[in-house]
A protein has these predicted regions:
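Transmembrane alpha-helical segments of polytopic membrane transport and secretion proteins
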Residues: 1-27, 139-146
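Alpha-helical transmembrane segments of integral membrane proteins
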Residues: 17-18, 111-147, 163, 187-270
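Residue-level signal for discrete positions within transmembrane alpha-helices
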Residues: 27, 110, 114, 153-160
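Hydrophobic alpha-helical transmembrane segments of membrane transport/permease proteins
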Residues: 31-80, 174, 178-192
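Juxtamembrane/transmembrane-helix interface segments of polytopic membrane transporters
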Residues: 34, 38-42, 167, 171-175, ...
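Membrane-water interface segments at the C-terminal ends of transmembrane alpha-helices
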Residues: 38-45, 82-84, 153-183, 199-201
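Short amphipathic alpha-helical coupling elements at transmembrane boundaries
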Residues: 64-67, 81, 85, 105, ...
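An internal, D/E-rich "acidic patch" concept
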Residues: 72-130
Length: 270
């Protein structure tokens, strides 16, 4: 019996590893095609885009610049060189943002700020969105459902209005009414983080509130909830010990994805 159990466990592990390898392989192939497509599309833009002072350059200088960038080579050769350098950790140098500064240096300076913003926004989103989802689910069981309606209105607003609109609104409101600084720099005070963190957390607040409310409402229709209610267990106890715990399990799978989306979104905020 023990041997069969071990073989079954080993088989499950192997199947899971095979599944993970398949998913990772597909993701890498997709990433390869996306990067290649973007690379090829970027190479189709006019030559003027590669020079900040194109109108002041002679034809010979333009040709020399194109040769220096390697743009005179066939597209497959350029793509192969790009992947070769990228695998070595060489992403080239900036020609417009910061002239002749390695891209890896620029990223090394900016990524810590993006990660800090993303982590702070995620913590705020969970601290607000999860209680909001709980309150909406509890309000859904009342007669007037006021809290559920207000929360639903907030979620619909955040999802319907373009992010740039309420980013701008928060920026104007925070700077004019509360006199909050708008720039985050290495020497900025903690107040400079309020506007970007709040702006980044709003989509995830709505996201967590919406899904947690849905899962909790679904749990209230289960048989174990009816049984606990029939036994006279308090509604708050059922909500806290049973409904919330079971409803929060599906939420965990969304946290990594939402964190990545938050970090990517911080580029716009910054």
């Amino acid at each position: 019996p023990f041997g069969n159990g071990r073989e079954e466990t080993t088989g499950r592990i192997l199947r899971m590893l095979k599944y993970l390898a398949k998913r990772i392989g597909r993701s890498l192939i997709t990433l390869f095609f996306i990067i290649s497509l973007v690379f090829c599309l970027m190479r189709q833009m006019p030559v003027e885009g590669y020079f900040t002072n194109y109108d002041k350059l002679t034809a010979a200088q333009v040709q020399a610049g194109i040769a220096q960038l390697g743009l005179d080579k066939p597209l497959p050769v350029q793509l192969a060189r790009f992947y070769r350098d990228a695998l070595r950790g060489d992403l080239g140098v900036s020609h417009i943002y910061r002239t002749n500064v390695p891209v890896t240096t620029i990223l090394a300076e900016k990524i810590p700020v993006s990660l800090k913003l993303g982590i702070a926004a995620m913590l705020l989103a969970m601290a607000v969105g999860i209680p909001m989802g709980i309150l909406m689910a509890r309000s859904n069981r009342t007669r007037h459902k006021l809290g559920d309606k207000l929360g639903t209105g907030f979620i619909v607003f955040i999802q319907a209005v373009p992010a740039a609109v309420y980013y701008l609104f928060l920026q104007l409101l925070g700077s004019d009414l509360f006199h909050l600084p708008m720039l985050v720099t290495g020497s900025a005070t903690w107040m400079a983080w309020i506007l970007p963190v709040v702006s980044l957390s709003l989509p995830n607040i709505a996201y967590y509130g919406m899904w947690l409310r849905r899962y909790m409402v679904d749990e209230t229709t289960k048989d174990y909830v009816r049984l606990a209610t029939a036994k006279g267990v308090k509604s708050s106890t059922i909500m806290r010990r049973h409904i919330f715990r079971n409803a929060f399990v599906p939420m965990v799978q969304y946290i990594p994805t939402s964190f990545l989306n938050t970090v990517v979104g911080s580029i716009y905020i910054e």
